[in-house]
Amino acid sequence: MIKRIKLRALTYLRNIYARIICPQVCFFCGEETGTGIPLCSKCLQKEITEPVLFRLKNPEKFCSSCGKILISEKEFCTDCRAKLREKENLRTEEREKSKKEDCAKPLLIQSDFLKKVYTIYPYKGRGGELLRLWKNQNMRGFAEIYASAIASFIEGMPELQNVPMVPVPPRPKKIKSKGWDQIEDLSLYLEQIYNLPILRCLKRMDGASQKSLSKEKRASNLKGKIFLKRQKSFSKSEDLKTVLPEKLIILDDVMTTGATLNFCAAALKEGGCKEVIGLCLFFD
C-alpha cells in the first residue's frame, strides 16, 4: 500500500514538474506532452498502445516460439526453424548414443527450458529510441507506460493470466553504478498499480554486459551466473522445489538471442517449476 502511494505520488510530482518547471516535448513530433515523459498522447497511442492491440489481434503474424514478427514465414521464424532442426538432430544423436551405452538419459537442450516467448515491440527503429531514453537517459517514467502496456497484453492473453512474473535480475555492478534497474521499476508498477503477481526469486552474479557481446559469447557469459536465491522464509533444509509455482513468466525488456531468458528458465526449472514462458517488451 505504501509503495503504491509512493508510485502515484511520484507520477503526480513528475507531471507537475513537467507542466510548470520543465515542460516536456514529444520526442517524435515536438508537441508539449504535459507529462513527465517525452511522448504526446497521439504518439503514445501510436507507439505504445496500438502495437499491443495489433499483437493481440494478429497472433499468427508472430513466431510461435520466440515471439518475433514473421515476414513471409508461417508459425515459426527462420531462426527458430533452424533451431528446431538442430534440436531434432541432437535428439537423434542422443537416442543413438543411448542405444550404444544402454542408457535412457535424455539430452537436456538449453531451449527446452523455455516453452515460448511473447514479445510486443520491434527494437529496431522507434522502439529502440524509446528504450534508450528509458534506460540511458534515466527517464524512469517510461516504466509506468510500459507497465500499462504489459498489463493490457496479459489481460488479452488467457495463457498469461494469474501467472507470477519473475523479473530478470540485474548485474550488481549495474545497480551500483546506475542506482536503479528498469526491470525492477517495471515490476513495481505491475505489482503495485495493476496487482499482478511478481516473484523476485532469481539472483545474478556480475559479468560483462550482454549488449556488448556477440551472439556466440552471450551464453558463455551467463553460464553459472543466474540462480535461485534463498529467501528468508526458506529453511536451510527446505527444498526450493516445494515453494516455486508450477508455471512462471520471465520478464525482460529486450530479447536478442534468448540467452538470458534461457538461463533464467533453467534456474527456475531446477527449482521445480514445470513450465516457463518468456515475456519481453522488445524483440531484436
State the predicted function of each range.
Residues M1-D284:
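Glycine-rich phosphate/pyrophosphate-handling loop used in enzymes and phosphotransfer proteins
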